[in-house]
From Swiss-Prot:
Pfam families reported for this sequence: Sugar_tr
Designated gene of the protein: MSSP1
Name recorded for this polypeptide: Monosaccharide-sensing protein 1
Regulation: Enhanced activation by VIK-mediated phosphorylation promoting carrier activity and consequently vacuolar sugar accumulation.
Keyword set, alphabetical order: Membrane, Phosphoprotein, Sugar transport, Transmembrane, Transmembrane helix, Transport, Vacuole
Species per Swiss-Prot/TrEMBL record: Arabidopsis thaliana
Length: 734
């Protein structure tokens, strides 16, 4: 995790520069207006030029990043920041200033669009939300430091707006250095181009270990778009006998053998009888079919069912049920029992076509304790001894004893990795094709119910879990395994972005979520308020609060703005802690009402004049409250969601669409705010923003699913499954 965290920190310097510039232009506009005597419409244009540049670059940044990679686009962003800083330092007139702001928009557009994508593609699922909150934290940190600089310069007799804006070139040099010499390319992008050796090395750097077999398998599977998907309710147990070498993986009793992405084990799974699956599959299908609200998207309930009553992330979450899930992608010499003898040879022919030493090191299981934190939490297991009446042995109730025994099944003290977030991936060969299984253990209550009430579990004693599986055809295609089984990734991605993929049901549903939340975020007014905070606070009378300090109204507004951004930082830290615990959806549903209340109180304080001091205090307090709760939820989460919900092959294209909507909305809000302030005043402006926040809460409740802790590939598959299942289902049932 250390490698992924450092890479995320380096990438988010681009967001630091964006935050720095947002605050700097807000402060510099006061002096630009005085120096150049600009009309109101031109004031908005100076600010909006960076937004125009961001919109222009965003329209092509996604497809280009799918073609050239994420890293080159981040390098270009750093170059744009550096050049625009130098030009703004020189700007002799408003025309040159507007050109510099346009270049600034190019840099900001690339950073805001691609940094969340880059982090999502390099971060483990367990901390992806936390790391993707770093752009908000560094952006707000950049704003705070910039306001400190602007406030200090405002105390001088003749502040220079050119110097304020030109300082941007200094931190942009650090960003340029890190993007060129430190940041690796996204491993998911590398896999999509068939550059398996490079992807493996990057994953090893990010994870801090040699064994990245599971991650490599998952990234290859992520190249798939669409395809038929089903859900199954399974009981899964460790295979404790030597299997044969045949490819048949289903016996006459319906018991399946699953091979996975790691070495030394295979597993047996059998479907849970339909009458006993109410805790798992049936409830999830019901979540798609039976809606308490007509307009509520069934996907919201489907995703929610995956997070209900899940095992806690803390504590010892290692598993004995999925310690070394077979090995399909490992190429070590010792093949596990029960696996087809030529299985690994077929996979090796693909993975090693450019590098003969791709084989996973067996020593990965002997890593020291410092490496344990790099491993994803695995399924906890239930160990039970059942008689013919399915009554559990008294000792089966001890979770502690169950987990203590979990490592004994393997003969060592280490568990292998899943694919992240407690998810696991298995494979079954059937009818000349491979089936891929994404497995997730049901919650504690579901497991307890399965032990007591599900007949047909593993006969006799044994260990098993009650798991739900999302099943689809693997990219290990329908060819004979005696030949080349895998469709090479470079052939899958050779055609570049697939515009036709935008018509896939899952992609369309994800676009509705991504575009909708980006539009509503902008029309909640945050960027307009940020750009014009000094003017807004000055009009609200904040100089009264700081008159005893002998500050001018302009300096006082800068100081209040700086203090506001300072208070935002601990709020973002709280959001970082909660992003992978409470989840994205929950944070939005809890923070948006606070935005509404703060805007309503701000409107009331403008309508009812108590005293100048009280009104100034209310206005300032509401602005601070609005900012703090915005950066906890509505600030980072739209970009986080958009970077998670699209398939790898079209992620750049879909992100470009969402980002273009983001920047167009930003332009409209920013350019219209000065006009609105002069026509309908603060009361009208913030009344509109409050109404949009109400609409936003309804949209989140109805349409936005929870994605915390889920691998990107699993998220996109569930979008596809949910959309397909709903489309093919009768109106009342699936």
């Amino acid at each position: 995790m250390k490698g992924a965290t450092l890479v995320a920190l380096a990438a988010t310097i681009g967001n630091f520069l964006q935050g720095w510039d947002n605050a700097t232009i807000a402060g510099a506009m006061v002096y630009i207006n005085k120096d150049l005597n600009l009309p109101t419409s031109v004031q908005g244009l100076v600010v909006a030029m960076s937004l125009i540049g961001a919109t222009v670059i965003t329209t092509c940044s996604g497809p280009i990043s799918d073609w050239l990679g994420r890293r080159p686009m981040l390098i270009l962003s750093s170059v744009m920041y550096f050049v625009c800083g130098l030009i703004m330092l020189w700007s002799p007139n408003v025309y040159v200033l507007c050109f510099a702001r346009l270049l600034n928009g190019f840099g900001a557009g690339l950073a805001v669009t691609l940094v969340p994508v880059y982090i999502s593609e390099t971060a483990p699922p367990e901390i992806r939300g936390q790391l993707n909150t770093l752009p908000q934290f560094l952006g707000s940190g950049g704003m705070f430091l910039s306001y400190c600089m602007v406030f200090t310069m405002s105390l001088s007799d003749s502040p220079s707006w050119r110097a304020m804006l030109g300082v941007l070139s200094i931190p942009s040099l650090l960003y340029l250095f890190l993007t060129v010499f430190y940041l690796p390319e996204s491993p998911r992008w590398l896999v999509s181009k068939g550059r398996m050796d490079e992807a493996k090395r990057v994953l090893q750097q990010l994870c801090g270990r040699e064994d990245v077999t599971d991650e490599m398998a998952l990234l290859v599977e992520g190249l798939d778009i669409g395809g038929e998907k089903t859900m199954e309710d399974l009981l899964v147990t460790l295979e404790d006998h030597e299997g044969d070498d045949t490819l048949e993986t289903v016996d006459e009793d319906g018991q399946m053998r699953l091979y996975g992405t790691h070495e030394n084990q295979s597993y047996l799974a059998r479907p849970v009888p339909e009458q006993n699956s109410s805790l798992g599959l049936r409830s999830r299908h019901g979540s798609l079919a039976n809606q308490s609200m007509i307009l509520k998207d069934p996907l919201v309930n489907l995703f929610g069912s995956l997070h209900e009553k899940m095992p806690e992330a803390g504590g010892n979450t290692r598993s004995g049920i999925f310690p070394h899930f077979g090995s399909m992608f490992s190429t070590t010499a010792d093949a596990p029992h029960g696996k087809p003898a030529h299985w690994e040879k077929d996979i090796e022919s693909h993975y090693n076509k450019d590098n003969d030493d791709y084989a996973t090191d067996d020593g990965a299981g002997d890593d020291d304790d410092s490496d344990n934190d790099l491993r994803s939490p695995l399924m906890s297991r239930q160990t039970t001894s059942m008689d013919k009446d399915m009554i559990p042995h008294p000792t089966s109730g001890s979770t502690l004893s169950m987990r203590r025994h979990s490592t004994l099944m393997q003969g060592n003290g280490e568990s292998s990795m899943g694919i992240g977030g407690g998810w696991h991936m298995g494979y079954r060969y059937e009818n000349d094709e491979y089936k891929r299984y994404y497995l997730k253990e049901d919650g504690a209550e579901s497991r307890r119910g399965s032990i007591i009430s599900i007949p047909g579990g593993p006969d006799g004693g044994g260990s098993y879990i009650h798991a739900s599986a999302l099943v689809s055809r693997s990219v290990l295609g329908p060819k004979s395994v005696h030949g080349s089984a895998m469709v090479p990734p470079e052939k899958i991605a050779a055609s570049g972005p697939l515009w036709s993929a935008l018509l896939e049901p899952g992609v369309k549903r994800a676009l509705v979520v991504g575009v909708g939340i980006q539009i509503l975020q902008q029309f909640s007014g945050i960027n307009g308020v940020l750009y014009y905070t000094p003017q807004i606070l000055e009009r609200a009378g904040v100089d009264i609060l700081l008159s005893s300090l002998g500050l001018s109204s302009i300096s006082a507004s800068f100081l209040i703005s700086g203090l506001t951004t300072l208070l935002m930082l601990p709020a973002i830290v709280v959001a970082m802690r909660l992003m992978d615990v409470s989840g994205r959806r929950s944070l939005l549903l809890w923070t948006i009402p606070v935005l509404i209340v703060s805007l309503v109180v701000l409107v009331i304080s403008e309508l009812i004049h108590i005293s100048k001091v009280v009104n100034a205090a209310l206005s300032t307090g509401c602005v601070v409250l609005y900012f703090c709760f915005f950066v906890m939820g509505y600030g980072p989460i739209p970009n986080i969601l958009c970077s998670e919900i699209f398939p790898t092959r079209v992620r750049g294209l879909c992100i470009a669409i969402c980002a273009m909507v983001f920047w167009i909305g930003d332009i409209i809000v920013t350019y219209s705010l000065p006009v609105l302030l002069s026509s309908i005043g603060l009361v009208g402006v913030f009344s509109i923003y409050a109404a949009v926040c109400v609409i936003s809460w309804i949209f989140v409740y109805m349409k936005v699913p929870e994605t915390k802790g889920m691998p990107l590939e699993v998220i996109t598959d569930y979008f596809a499954f949910g959309a397909q299942a709903q489309a093919s289902a009768p109106s009342k049932d699936i």
